Amino acid sequence: MTSSCVVLVADAHLGDASAIPEEAFHRFLCAVPDLGDELLINGDLFDFWFEYRSVVPRRHFGTFAQLHELRRRGMPITFVGGNHDRWGGDFLRRDVGIAFYGGEAELTLAGRRAFVAHGDGLTEQHLSAKLLHRVTRHPATIGLFRTLHPDLGLWLAKKLSGHLADGNGDGAVRDQAARAQAEFACSLLKRRAELDLVILGHTHRPALQCLPGNRAYVNPGAWLDGFRYALITNSEVELRRFEP
């Protein structure tokens, strides 16, 4: 069944000690059924998430419980991984019931064809960021990390979390990346007439650029920056803020 209104959220970075507490996001998840009938999480829901084969890190139990409850109530949930949480797998897909993509995806949202990507790796300005993007996606890197004890792996990830941001914490870098994303999105829409939407995240900069023919580029901005999200219907895209 095609959804009539998709709730879009990105860049909550749950687990980052400096970010907004998870309870605010849990209140948002409770409100999602009143906002729309499908949830799309476009990357960096967590400041770090890595799925082990037989161990589930306890840090985000409450969030997964909320997501599982939404699925139990029939809410479709899609999660496109970001540079902090692209390493999901069977736990998300089978146990929680989420449609998980480790990279970009093409989806039908509210009857509109959409290219969805978190945005890292698309417009990186520095060679080091491009290299990091390739290394963290490589199967050998993922396999090696999986051999570490989870306590050690999560400790190491916490220490390296800043590097996963690709230098994206600098305001000027984010502004430049946001401009590059808009150019990328408009170019993609121009090249591919079958696409109605391009949906990105990563820069923490909200953006909505509407084009003729009911087509648009949208970045909802960062949830951690003022509880930002967006709504997508068959005819509109709207940037919003949640009141927790």
Positions of the model-derived regions?
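Beta-strand-turn-beta hairpins that frame and shape the catalytic cleft
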Residues: 1-7, 107-115, 211-216
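Core catalytic region of metal-dependent phosphoesterases/phosphodiesterases
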Residues: 2-5, 14-109
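Short, basic/glycine-rich phosphate-binding loops at helix/coil junctions
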Residues: 4-11, 44-46, 155-168
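Residue-level marker for buried hydrophobic side chains located in beta-strands
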Residues: 6-8, 39-41, 115, 199
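Active-site metal-binding loops of divalent metal-dependent hydrolases
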Residues: 10-13, 44-45, 83-84, 119-120, ...
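Hydrophobic positions within alpha-helical membrane elements
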Residues: 16, 49, 87-88, 123, ...
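Conserved beta-sheet core of the metallophosphoesterase superfamily
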Residues: 95-102, 115, 120, 124-132, ...
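Active-site-proximal loop/helix segment associated with metal-binding centers of metalloenzymes
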Residues: 119-181
